[in-house]
């Protein structure tokens, strides 16, 4: 089974209840959506990348009533949930595809909204390169992803039990900015915040992650079963991190990103450069 199939299967399994249980992802997306409303843009075509059950596709359609929305997700089951949210007067295409190889024409979108999806890619550079391709000149990319401190409690607790990786690897915000520039995006703005979610019990915490589609795809993960001894060590170590009220904390390092697609200009030597659209001056 490929990594994409693993991810799709994990999300599809919980598609019916995803919007109800994925409160963290919805809150993060709402904060990104709030930032979007401050931008003075009028996109004609919008891609909701990793649209899931379609909550933000619907919000985007309300914010930009004249725009054509396209929802894309790896999971067919998620897209079926998104389809149910569409009114009979206004429907939008729903596409199942890999974000590293999207079935869209070059320059198709003026805005890409990507909430909690790009960290599921095996190559951030390939995702940004493909996004740059499908975006129109002066198009805007708005996204959220996760940083290295995400699930740090899980990392610490499992490190006391065995040498395997139990948490996915997340890219540092500074490296994300560098990657955007390397893939010809202009004026990237990256910032982060830490969110701490508290659970009454450890099983409750782990179940919440499972029902949110969270899956360990780290190449260094244990491909076999975890023994009872390692599990008990994990539980004991996590218990030492409980709050003063006895709850189990779980940290999310949330990274917010915004960038623009600049204009491409060919030099006499055949070398291509990318410049902000604001610097493009038409000759009279």
Curated annotation (Swiss-Prot):
Disulfide bonds: none annotated. InterPro entries: BioC (IPR011814), Malonyl-ACP_OMT (IPR050602), Methyltransf_11 (IPR013216), SAM-dependent_MTases_sf (IPR029063). The keyword S-adenosyl-L-methionine applies. It catalyses: malonyl-[ACP] + S-adenosyl-L-methionine = malonyl-[ACP] methyl ester + S-adenosyl-L-homocysteine. GO terms for biological process: biotin biosynthetic process; methylation. It is an enzyme of class 2 (transferase). Pfam families: Methyltransf_11. The keyword Methyltransferase applies. CDD domains: AdoMet_MTases (cd02440). One of its GO terms (molecular function) is S-adenosylmethionine-dependent methyltransferase activity. Keywords: Biotin biosynthesis, Methyltransferase, S-adenosyl-L-methionine, Transferase. Its EC number is 2.1.1.197. Pathway: Cofactor biosynthesis; biotin biosynthesis. PANTHER family: ARGININE-HYDROXYLASE NDUFAF5, MITOCHONDRIAL. NCBIfam families: BioC. Converts the free carboxyl group of a malonyl-thioester to its methyl ester by transfer of a methyl group from S-adenosyl-L-methionine (SAM). It allows to synthesize pimeloyl-ACP via the fatty acid synthetic pathway. Belongs to the methyltransferase superfamily. This is Malonyl-[acyl-carrier protein] O-methyltransferase. It comes from Legionella pneumophila subsp. pneumophila (strain Philadelphia 1 / ATCC 33152 / DSM 7513). The gene is bioC.
């Amino acid at each position: 089974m490929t990594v994409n199939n693993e991810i799709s299967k994990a999300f599809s399994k919980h598609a019916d209840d995803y919007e109800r249980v994925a409160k963290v992802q919805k809150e993060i997306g709402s904060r990104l959506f709030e930032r979007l409303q401050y931008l003075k843009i009028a996109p004609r075509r919008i891609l909701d990348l990793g649209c899931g059950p379609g909550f933000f596709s619907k919000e985007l359609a309300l914010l930009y009533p004249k725009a054509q929305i396209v929802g894309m997700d790896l999971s067919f089951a998620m897209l079926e949930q998104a389809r149910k949210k569409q009114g009979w007067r206004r429907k939008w295409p729903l596409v199942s595809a890999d974000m590293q190889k999207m079935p869209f024409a070059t320059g198709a979108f003026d805005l890409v909204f990507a909430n909690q999806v790009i960290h599921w890619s095996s190559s951030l550079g390939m995702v940004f390169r493909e996004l740059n391709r499908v975006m129109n000149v002066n198009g805007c990319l708005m996204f959220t992803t996760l940083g290295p401190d995400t699930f740090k409690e899980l990392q610490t607790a499992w490190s006391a039990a065995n040498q395997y990786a139990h948490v996915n690897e997340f890219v540092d915000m500074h490296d994300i900015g560098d990657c955007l520039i390397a893939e010809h995006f202009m004026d990237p703005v990256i910032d982060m915040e830490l969110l701490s979610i508290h659970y009454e019990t450890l099983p409750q915490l782990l179940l919440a992650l499972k029902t949110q589609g969270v899956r360990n795809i780290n190449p260094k993960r244990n491909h076999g079963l975890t023994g009872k001894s390692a599990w008990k060590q994990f539980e004991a170590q996590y218990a030492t991190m409980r709050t003063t009220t006895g709850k189990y904390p779980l940290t999310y390092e949330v990274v917010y990103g915004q960038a623009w697609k600049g204009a491409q200009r060919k030099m006499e030597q055949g070398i291509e450069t990318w410049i902000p659209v604001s610097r493009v001056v038409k000759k009279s």
